[in-house]
């Protein structure tokens, strides 16, 4: 059941989604509805697939929190989180790609994020930036974070071979009882998990085991971002689907003859939405990670 505060946020966000409210109908400045309805939003048309209001409420977001966003990409969630937290006395820490390492594509993503979010402090606040690097390191001061968010990037950590370590670094950054919210393209529950997640999909049990092995407690799962039309069997992995609509293998020229219509009809991927918590007491014995293919 929603709290009174969550119900109010949901109401104001719903008004924001109904068009251009004016006067008394406009969401209050600084509310989550205001942040969701702002003209600064990145690709708000994706809300029908990613359900940011329901997802953020499920994870427990509040305006005064310190939030750690791991690998924010181009900033789809940053464009919601940064204004909302800045308006309410909260703080956003963005742990992005290492500008001194990684791939050219990762550096280009980082540069695009920086160009968008580092020049308007009156809107986005002063976002603290840290690095997710191959060498490891603190993502935030130990025990300083209320909520950490991993949105559609567990597969990236797996591809780089650093998923287990980063989950541990997130745990260290969180306050006792702090939460970790995960959104991730969901693989079929049968078969072996590709340890590099080459198609972008990860089994839900595998993500849970990664978190529990790091010391997290599982809290709850939501199907708010589920898409039963996603068969997961696409020629270019999850990137065959919107919003990417890839038409050729990575590194190859686009294929203008490739028919994207069937994949547009599917919509964005089927996704798990999970919530974990850092224990408030002594850490539990880690769980074993499920089998993966060699």
Locate predicted features:
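N-terminal secretory signal peptides and thylakoid transit peptides that target proteins
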Residues: 1-14
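Class I SAM-dependent methyltransferase Rossmann-like catalytic core
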Residues: 32-56
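Conserved class I S-adenosyl-L-methionine
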Residues: 64-73
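Helix-to-beta-strand junctions that scaffold the AdoMet/dcAdoMet cofactor pocket
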Residues: 86, 158, 174-175
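A short acidic, Gly/Pro-enriched loop at the edge of an enzyme's catalytic core
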Residues: 139-148
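A short glycine-rich, Lys/Arg-flanked "PGG" loop and its adjoining helix->strand segment in the class I
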Residues: 164-176
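Conserved beta-strand signature within the Rossmann-like core of class I S-adenosyl-L-methionine
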Residues: 177-184
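C-terminal lobe and adjacent flexible extensions of AdoMet/dcAdoMet transferase-like proteins
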Residues: 260-294
């Amino acid at each position: 059941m929603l709290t009174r505060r969550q119900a109010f946020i949901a109401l104001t966000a719903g008004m924001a989604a109904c068009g251009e409210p004016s006067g008394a109908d406009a969401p209050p400045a600084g509310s989550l509805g205001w942040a969701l309805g702002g003209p600064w939003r990145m690709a708000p048309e994706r809300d029908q697939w990613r359900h940011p209001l329901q997802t953020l409420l499920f994870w427990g977001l509040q305006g005064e929190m310190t939030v750690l966003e791991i690998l924010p990409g181009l900033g789809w969630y940053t464009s919601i989180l940064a204004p909302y937290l800045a308006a309410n006395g909260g703080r956003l820490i963005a742990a992005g790609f290492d500008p001194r390492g990684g791939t050219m594509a990762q550096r280009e993503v980082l540069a695009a994020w920086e160009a968008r979010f580092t020049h308007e402090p009156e809107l986005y606040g002063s976002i603290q930036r840290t690095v997710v690097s191959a060498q490891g390191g603190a993502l935030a001061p130990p025990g300083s974070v209320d909520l950490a968010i991993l949105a559609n990037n567990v597969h990236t950590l797996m591809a780089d071979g650093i998923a287990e370590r980063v989950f541990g670094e997130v745990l260290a950054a969180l306050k006792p009882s702090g939460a970790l919210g995960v959104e991730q393209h969901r693989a079929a529950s049968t078969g072996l998990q590709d340890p590099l997640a080459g198609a972008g999909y990860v089994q839900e049990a595998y993500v849970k085991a990664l978190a529990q092995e790091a010391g997290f407690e599982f809290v709850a799962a939501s199907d708010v971002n589920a898409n039963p039309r996603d068969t997961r069997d696409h020629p270019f992995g999850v990137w065959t689907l919107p919003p990417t609509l890839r038409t050729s293998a990575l590194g190859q020229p686009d294929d203008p003859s490739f028919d994207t219509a069937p994949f547009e009809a599917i919509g964005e991927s089927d996704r798990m939405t999970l919530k974990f918590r850092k224990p408030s007491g002594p850490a539990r014995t880690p769980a074993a990670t499920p089998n993966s293919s060699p």
